[in-house]
């Protein structure tokens, strides 16, 4: 049977090739210069279990902007869409005291009138890879200036837990040695909210996101009075390496 017309995406990546990545802005300047976003969570979740969550924010613009810069992060991982198009993935892996965020310019994908931001956020839970630090499931989208503040993450965002996903744990005996990567995944496609990144999607059964603390820039916050001198939450630092690429490659006929 011919596989003509079928495309495979090699996911080597963090951000789509040629995507609108902006200059990574130092955290202290970002979080002091704009209305503060809030870390948001799926209500009712413990924040530590395996879970795949969809976040959405519909908003309106009077005109198409020439620039619309935002800063994005999540725990464990996220994939961001604007009007149905993938725009960014991350964050770059690090630890809680140096939690990374990506800076992206959404302007090229925006239009006058209604727009929708959508984020897929997942937490591997107890089966997370050895290199993955985590505080709890969460998502953050921070405006770069007051003009982008309409999309700041907060209770205006909607969220849906995707119950179609389940982890497939991998143990050392099953691979013949030490295993430090994420689990496999099983997906029941009948329970997937197809079309959820687009404007025409109806948010039936979605909930208002629960909101927590605002963002904190690493090394600029007072240290908590605990034996380790650590501040609470995610201490944010700009991405330090270039994003990798995703390249579509077609099967041979």
Model-derived segments and spans:
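Positively charged n-region of N-terminal signal peptides that target proteins for export
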Residues: 1-5
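Bacterial N-terminal signal peptides
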Residues: 7-17
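Signal peptide processing junction and immediate N-terminal pro/mature segment
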Residues: 18-24
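An acidic-aromatic loop/edge-strand motif
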Residues: 24-45, 120-253
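Extracellular beta-rich ligand/substrate-recognition surface
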Residues: 43-53, 91-99
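Aromatic-lined ligand-binding clefts that engage carbohydrates, nucleic acids, or primary amines
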Residues: 59-62, 66-81, 117-119, 206
């Amino acid at each position: 049977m011919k596989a003509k017309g079928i495309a495979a995406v090699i996911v080597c990546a963090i951000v789509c090739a040629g995507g609108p990545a902006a200059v990574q802005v130092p955290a202290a300047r970002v979080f002091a210069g704009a209305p503060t976003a809030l870390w948001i969570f799926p209500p009712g979740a413990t924040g530590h279990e395996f879970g795949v969550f969809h976040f959405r924010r519909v908003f309106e613009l009077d005109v198409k902007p020439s620039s619309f810069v935002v800063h994005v992060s999540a725990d464990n991982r996220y994939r961001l869409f604007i009007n149905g198009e993938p725009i960014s993935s991350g964050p770059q892996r690090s630890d809680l005291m140096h939690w990374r965020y990506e800076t992206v310019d959404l302007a090229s994908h925006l239009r006058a009138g209604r727009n929708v931001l959508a984020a897929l956020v997942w937490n591997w839970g107890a089966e997370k890879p050895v290199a993955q630090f985590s505080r709890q499931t969460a998502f953050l989208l921070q405006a770069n200036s007051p003009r982008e503040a309409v999309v700041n993450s907060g209770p205006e965002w909607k969220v849906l837990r995707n119950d179609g996903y389940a982890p497939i744990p991998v143990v050392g005996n099953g691979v013949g040695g030490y295993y430090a990567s994420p689990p496999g995944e099983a997906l029941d496609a009948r329970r997937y909210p197809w079309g959820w990144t687009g404007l025409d999607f109806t948010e039936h059964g979605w909930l208002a996101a629960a909101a927590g603390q605002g963002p904190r820039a690493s090394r600029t916050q007072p240290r908590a009075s605990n034996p380790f001198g650590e501040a609470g939450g995610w201490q944010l630092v700009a991405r330090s390496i270039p994003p990798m690429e995703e390249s579509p490659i077609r099967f041979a006929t």
